Amino acid sequence: MNVRFAEHDDLTAIEEVTRWACSEAIGEMVPEDVVESEVHRRFRRSVLSEHLLSRRLLVGVSANNDIELVVLVDDRTDHIELVTSVVPTRPSRAADGVSLVDSLRFMGWLGPISSSVPLGDTVHEHFYELAGFAPGEVTVERVEGHDVFRREWWLDPVLSAAG
C-alpha cells in the first residue's frame, strides 16, 4: 500500500470508503441513521476539504489504485490524533498500518500518535496492532442517543539516537 496526500479528485472515492468502513465498523451496534450521523460528523465534505487544503488528509492506495485507507491528521497538545477509515479486509490482504506509520514519520510527525477505534472493529484493531500501536483506555461516546464504546490506540514517539 502506498500512502500519499489526498488530492481533490479523491474526495468522492474517500466519501464512499468512509461510508462503507463506518457502516462495517459500527453498523451492528447502532441503527443505520446513527452510522450516517457518525460519517457526517467525522467525514463530511467540509471536514475532508479542510484537511485536504492543510495537507492533513492522507490516503492509502493499493497496487490497483484503489483507496483502502483514509486518514485525517489532527494536532493535539502533546501528540497527533488520527481519524481513520480502513476498508474492510479481503480474504487475501488487509490495509497495511506499517506503511502508514512509516509515511507519517517520513512526513515529519515524530511524536506520539493516537487513534480512537470502536470496540469490536477488528479490522481497525488489527490494523493498529500490526503497526505497533498499543491498546489504551476505553471511552464511551454518545452518538444520536446511542453509546459507542471506543478504545484509544497509542504509538510512542520516535526516539532520537543523539539522546
Could you describe each region identified by the protein language model?
Residues M1-T12, W153-G163:
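Conserved N-terminal entry element of GNAT/NAT acetyltransferase domains
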Residues F5-H8, R19-S92, V98-M107, E141, ...:
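Acetyl-CoA-dependent GNAT
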Residues D9, A13, I67, T122-V123:
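Short alpha-helical
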Residues I14, T18:
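Hydrophobic pocket/interface hotspot
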Residues D78, L110-I113, A134:
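Short acidic/polar active-site loop segments enriched in Thr and Asp
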Residues R105, Y128-T139:
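Conserved acetyl-CoA-binding loop of GNAT-fold acetyltransferases
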Residues S114-H126, R142-G145:
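Conserved beta-strand-loop-alpha-helix junction that forms the acyl-donor binding cleft
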Residues L130, V140-G163:
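Terminal substrate-recognition subdomain of acyl/acetyltransferases
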